[in-house]
C-alpha cells in the first residue's frame, strides 16, 4: 500500500494571513484579543489560537468596550463594521482579499441599481458577510441567494434586465458552472464578474484531488466538518467514483477503510495545517503504508499583506 500526496494542499494565502494577524495582534497588543467567528474553519488552529490568548465570539455584543477585535477570513457584513466603529472597537480585518473582492463587486452592482444573485450556501459566514454588503442606504439594488439549480427555476428577481451574479469563493467549480448556466438561460442579460470568483486555492486543490481520484482507490481529506472547501474536496473525489472521507485528524481514520486498498490519496483543505497531514501519514504507516510520493501540482506563490500596523510593530 502506498500514499500519494496532493499538491497543492493545506493552507492558502488567505488562511496564512488570517492566522498571522491573530498571532501578531496577541504578540504586539497582548491577550486577550477577540475574534469574531472562527478565524478559519479548523479546530486545531482555533484551539492553538485560544491557548495563545484569542477569545472567539459570534457577535460583537460579546466583545467588551475598548477591546481589540479581529474579523475572520470569511468577512463580515457592513452592519458589523458599522457597529464596531460606533462602539470604538479597535479592529483588525482578516477578511481574505479574494472575499473582499466579491464584497466590492456586490456593492458596485447595488450602487448601480442592479440586482445581484449570490451563489452560495445559506448560513455560511462568508455568504452572510457578502449578503450583508447590500443595504437600502447603499443603493436600490437587491441581493438574492441561490444554493442549487432547482432554486433557479423558482427565482423571482426585481429587474431581470439589470442583473448580475457572484459566487461564494469556496464552492465546487462544477456546481457553480451548472447554476450559472441555468441562470443565463432564464436571464440572458445577466452580468458576471470579469474573473471567476472561485478562488485560485480552491480551484488548485480541486484539480489536485481529481488527479488523486484518477490514481487512487481511497482519498482522505484532512479538514474540519465546518470547512466548506474541505467538504467540497471529499465530495469531488466521491463524484469521480472513489471512496473518500473527511477527517479532522489521524485519530478519525477507521482501519477498515484501508483493507484491500493499494493506493491511498491524501490532501488537506485550505484551512488545515501540514502538521495534521503529517499525523495522518504517520498513522497510515502504522497501518501498513510503505511508500509516499507527491503529485507535481500547480505552484502557488501568492502572499497577502498584513495590516500596516502589525507590519510596523514587527519591524520596530
From Swiss-Prot:
GO biological process, any: isopentenyl diphosphate biosynthetic process, methylerythritol 4-phosphate pathway
Binding locations of dimethylallyl diphosphate: 41, 74, 124, 227-229, 271
Reaction(s) catalysed (UniProt annotation): isopentenyl diphosphate + 2 oxidized [2Fe-2S]-[ferredoxin] + H2O = (2E)-4-hydroxy-3-methylbut-2-enyl diphosphate + 2 reduced [2Fe-2S]-[ferredoxin] + 2 H(+); dimethylallyl diphosphate + 2 oxidized [2Fe-2S]-[ferredoxin] + H2O = (2E)-4-hydroxy-3-methylbut-2-enyl diphosphate + 2 reduced [2Fe-2S]-[ferredoxin] + 2 H(+)
EC number, as in UniProt: 1.17.7.4
Keyword Oxidoreductase: yes
GO molecular function, one term: 4-hydroxy-3-methylbut-2-enyl diphosphate reductase activity
Pfam families hit by this protein: LYTB (PF02401)
Broad enzyme group: oxidoreductase
Family matches, as InterPro entries: LytB/IspH
The keyword 4Fe-4S appears for this protein: yes
Keywords: 4Fe-4S, Iron, Iron-sulfur, Isoprene biosynthesis, Metal-binding, Oxidoreductase
Cofactor stoichiometry and binding remark: Binds 1 [4Fe-4S] cluster per subunit.
Binding sites annotated in the UniProt record for [4Fe-4S] cluster: 12, 96, 199
One Gene Ontology cellular component: cytosol
Binding site residues for (2E)-4-hydroxy-3-methylbut-2-enyl diphosphate: 41, 74, 124, 169, 227-229, 271
NCBIfam families in UniProt: ispH_lytB, PRK01045.1-2, PRK01045.1-4
PANTHER family: 4-HYDROXY-3-METHYLBUT-2-ENYL DIPHOSPHATE REDUCTASE
Task performed by this protein: Catalyzes the conversion of 1-hydroxy-2-methyl-2-(E)-butenyl 4-diphosphate (HMBPP) into a mixture of isopentenyl diphosphate (IPP) and dimethylallyl diphosphate (DMAPP). Acts in the terminal step of the DOXP/MEP pathway for isoprenoid precursor biosynthesis.
Protein name: 4-hydroxy-3-methylbut-2-enyl diphosphate reductase
Amino acid at each position: 500500500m502506498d500514499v500519494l500526496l496532493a499538491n497543492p494542499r493545506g493552507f492558502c494565502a488567505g488562511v496564512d494571513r488570517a492566522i498571522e494577524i491573530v498571532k501578531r495582534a496577541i504578540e504586539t497588543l497582548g491577550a486577550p484579543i477577540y475574534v469574531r467567528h472562527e478565524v478559519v474553519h479548523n479546530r486545531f488552529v482555533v484551539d492553538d489560537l485560544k491557548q495563545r490568548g484569542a477569545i472567539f465570539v459570534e457577535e460583537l455584543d460579546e466583545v467588551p468596550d475598548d477591546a481589540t477585535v479581529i474579523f475572520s477570513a470569511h468577512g463580515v457584513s457592513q452592519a458589523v463594521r458599522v457597529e464596531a466603529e460606533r462602539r470604538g472597537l479597535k479592529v483588525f480585518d482578516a477578511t481574505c482579499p479574494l472575499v473582499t473582492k466579491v464584497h466590492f463587486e456586490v456593492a458596485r452592482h447595488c450602487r448601480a441599481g442592479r440586482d445581484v444573485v449570490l451563489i452560495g450556501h445559506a448560513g455560511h459566514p462568508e455568504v452572510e458577510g457578502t449578503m450583508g454588503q447590500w443595504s437600502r442606504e447603499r443603493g436600490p439594488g437587491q441581493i438574492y441567494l441561490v444554493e442549487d439549480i432547482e432554486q433557479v427555476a423558482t427565482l423571482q428577481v426585481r429587474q431581470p434586465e439589470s442583473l448580475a451574479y457572484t459566487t461564494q469563493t469556496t464552492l465546487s467549480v462544477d456546481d457553480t458552472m451548472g447554476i450559472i448556466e441555468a441562470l443565463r438561460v432564464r436571464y440572458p442579460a445577466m452580468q458576471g464578474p470579469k474573473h471567476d470568483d472561485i478562488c485560485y486555492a480552491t480551484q488548485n486543490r480541486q484539480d489536485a484531488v481529481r488527479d488523486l481520484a484518477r490514481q487512487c482507490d481511497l482519498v482522505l481529506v484532512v479538514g474540519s466538518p465546518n470547512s466548506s472547501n474541505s467538504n467540497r474536496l471529499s465530495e469531488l473525489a466521491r463524484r469521480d467514483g472513489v471512496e473518500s472521507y473527511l477527517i479532522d485528524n489521524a485519530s478519525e481514520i477507521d482501519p477498515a477503510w484501508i483493507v484491500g486498498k493499494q493506493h491511498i490519496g491524501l490532501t488537506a483543505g485550505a484551512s488545515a495545517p501540514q502538521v495534521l497531514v503529517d499525523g495522518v501519514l504517520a498513522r497510515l504507516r502504522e497501518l501498513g503504508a510503505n511508500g509516499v510520493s507527491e503529485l507535481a501540482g500547480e505552484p502557488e506563490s501568492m502572499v497577502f499583506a498584513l495590516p500596516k500596523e502589525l507590519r510596523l510593530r514587527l519591524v520596530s
